[in-house]
Amino acid sequence: MSDYKHTLNLPQTDFPMRGNLPQREPDMLKRWGDIELYEKIREEFKGREKFILHDGPPYANGNIHLGHAVNKILKDIIVKSKTVAGYDAPYVPGWDCHGLPIEHKVETMIGRAGDKVGYKEFRRKCREYALEQVAKQREDFIRLGVFGDWFKPYLTLDFKTEADIIRALGKIATSGHLQKGYKPVYWSVVGGSALAEAEVEYKDKTSNSIDVSYPAENEQDLLSAFADASGEGAVSIVIWTTTPWTLPASLAVSLGAEIDYALTQCSVDGRPQRWIVAEKMLESVMARCGVEDYQVVGRCTGQDLEGKTFLHPFYKRSIPALLGDHVTLDAGTGVVHTAPDHGMEDFAVCNKYGIETINPLDDRGVYRDNVELFAGEHVYKVDDHVIEVLKERGRLLSHGKITHSYAHCWRTKTPLIYRATPQWFISMDKQGLRDQALAEIKLVRWVPSWGQNRIEAMIEQSPDWCISRQRTWGVPIAFFVHKETQELHPDTARLVEEVAKQVEKTGIDAWWDINAEDLLGADAQNYEKVTDTLDVWFDSGVTHSAVLEQREELGQFPADLYLEGSDQHRGWFQSSLKTAVAIKGKAPYRQVLTHGFTVDEKGHKMSKSLGNGIEPQEVMNKLGADILRLWVAATDYSAEMVLSKNILERTADSYRRIRNTSRFLLANINDFDPVKDMVAMDDLLALDRWIVDRAWLLQEELKKAYEQYNFVQVYQKVHNFCSVELGSFYLDVIKDRQYTMKLDSLGCRSAQTAQYHVIEALVRWIAPILSFTAEEIWSYIPGQRAESIFLETFYEGLQPLAEGSEMGRDYWSRLLRVRTSVNKALEEARNAGKVKGSLTTEVSLFATPEMQHDLNALGEELRFVFITSGASVFGVEDASESNSVATETEGLRVGIRSSEHKKCGRCWHHREDVGAHGSHEDLCGRCIENIDGSGEERKYA
């Protein structure tokens, strides 16, 4: 038998089968840097319609984790998909650079500011440290293949940005949304500073649970509130608390106006007593206190008890009964001990009754010297002493432990307290900010849609935002206030601008260096500088003003999109919304997209302590960034995002399918010159015309999916196209034609033209997701092209089939269904040992008239569609159990038999004319025509 390999057009390409991504990707990054690709993209798309995704700044501290990677990859997929869709989509990454975690790090290195080191030097070290962290994180983000202006990012520590943050504060102040108040705020005793709601996270904490009695100050007066009071023994009201440390600050008890209270006779240690408790809570209170025998000896409502007084359990302090809407019957006694220093509701109800705070704690959570019994003790450690004192005074009725959800600092992970201090607030209601924000929320597109309900609920319940911090490393609240009244200077707008100009030159140190006399003149003796700094959520929250509107390449408000993790409804989305509405009266974003957290296969949050964490660096070093990017695209980001080693392996398999399909296409067009070999669309063979139409249709679907941020659909459709329509059908069918026909024949060039169109489109479809691989593929596609795929838009060489085409979409859909049924029958026959490969067989198709029409339309080329050596069509009435088997396709039976003919040594088909030609005894007539003659002709497949 002769070797005919040299007569075949076999696929050939230098495009590697193995991705070898961990080695190739860094080389690609270097090339992108060398050619200044990001800058070239900006130049190429200059003047087109803009799409602005505004980057929520990660905190400049520590290595990036998987959550960071997910966030940046999602942003990059969107920015690149908008670019390929023809938008000018610049991406300016940012970093949040002020605040407590950086202060803590620097404190461990050089000591506390004002103690071991001067404030200016401390701020210099903080700046230095933050910039080091930015450099580290930037390297990892770039390694992910994320495009952006990485070496001109926005940093909240940039002098210009710091100045613009101060300007934004000035605008909010002059628009009347700012107020100074003495209110309880979340306070970190570890950090010695106030915290905003967004900096609070809730974790389980085990606390002391105690019931305490407050004796009546005037029993006779108190009992007059009960119309039918009887019984004997001392009268007291019972409170329940899980924060014994707040009792030194207890100034009142609160009751519900409409709640029914019971005067209850009981006996404790043989002594008769009468307790006042909400009647509905009586059973649970008595059970907690170990009292079995009791009876109600009087009833009244909370309203009846208003103004009655009790005595503090261990101080000589009169405790009035107040009415408060916050009192519920969910737990406790229906009576709430009220400490205005340590709770918003407590503060509000005391404020209504004219009861002032007493400020018993210092910044570090230590009781001041004037606090009787507990001076010098720390809130974290004082509970046992408080309980001991209550026991000694006979006021402790029960003591247990309770595990409950408790506020913790999201940075230091330590429990928070409420502490009343003078602070600066953005008022939610003074100028109607809450209502305006709620109205703006409705105009924004929220992805997923439940995000709208979530942020609406948060804004509805949001307290005034405490924006002041008692820290060293932060943007100053650059105001002058009157020494006596604490009112803002009447010329605040001008003064803020003067300060901002100085900060623009030398940074936030300018505020501390400014001489008040230089700005205020004679007024300086009556005014003082505010020494507080801004909440870091204010820094990032005003980047719509300090960055979006300031950067020339962005230059628009609102942004098209904000994209962050789902925790940012209470964080950056909310702080940005409040400040934008306060300054501009508008939301800072048109769309908001949120993604879920990363979890392991069991749904557990990833953490080092659990040992289930997967670091992005580990994935990139082992599998490559493109595998991580593909996992992000293939995962539903609207819920928790599950990742494990098994999932990564499956993702790598999917990647190989896309890569191998691309490689096969490249191998098939290796000698193709699109300038001279391209076949006109109308001249393509029917099957080739169909695959181009299918690619056109898919491209339209992918454009829509990208536009809707439905990357799972993009992944599924592309993967399905590669594995089913290309891999299992089209590329399988055309092998014979492409390999065996004359290279310059219409049949061969038509197949190459179609594949050229497909790879040109496919490479663009995957570029936003598989960025490294797409760029690699791009460099192997024949023909002149731009130096990067990322300078291109969606491929315009695809065309849909004309409506009503004889062999249109419906025709090929019907044929594919028949082919699937034939393949199944062939597989069953092969498994049963009746036949070998499909080319050793001939098939008989017994079909309905309509189906016969479809099948006969392909004439002699029908066998190529089934990859069999013969295919005959008969009426379904000619079928029998002996000559065919039923199929899933209604009206179709298939007969399969081994061919009796010899095998062609070149095309491997079994044909009756093999050996009929003397010059080539082992070839079929078709192959001889393709070698020695003018070549076979095909019309369809």
From Swiss-Prot:
Positions bound to Zn(2+): C904, C907, C924, C927
Molecular function terms, GO-annotated: aminoacyl-tRNA deacylase activity; ATP binding; isoleucine-tRNA ligase activity; tRNA binding; zinc ion binding
CDD domains according to UniProt: Anticodon_Ia_Ile_BEm (cd07960), IleRS_core (cd00818)
Signal among keywords: no
Residue window of motif 'KMSKS' region: 605-609
Keywords assigned: Aminoacyl-tRNA synthetase, ATP-binding, Cytoplasm, Ligase, Metal-binding, Nucleotide-binding, Protein biosynthesis, Zinc
GO biological process, one term: isoleucyl-tRNA aminoacylation
Cofactor(s), by name: Zn(2+)
Subcellular location: Cytoplasm
Protein's job: Catalyzes the attachment of isoleucine to tRNA(Ile). As IleRS can inadvertently accommodate and process structurally similar amino acids such as valine, to avoid such errors it has two additional distinct tRNA(Ile)-dependent editing activities. One activity is designated as 'pretransfer' editing and involves the hydrolysis of activated Val-AMP. The other activity is designated 'posttransfer' editing and involves deacylation of mischarged Val-tRNA(Ile).
UniProt cross-references to PANTHER family, sorted A to Z: ISOLEUCINE--TRNA LIGASE, MITOCHONDRIAL, SOLEUCYL-TRNA SYNTHETASE
Family: Belongs to the class-I aminoacyl-tRNA synthetase family. IleS type 1 subfamily.
Protein name listed in UniProt: Isoleucine--tRNA ligase
Organism this protein belongs to: Hahella chejuensis (strain KCTC 2396)
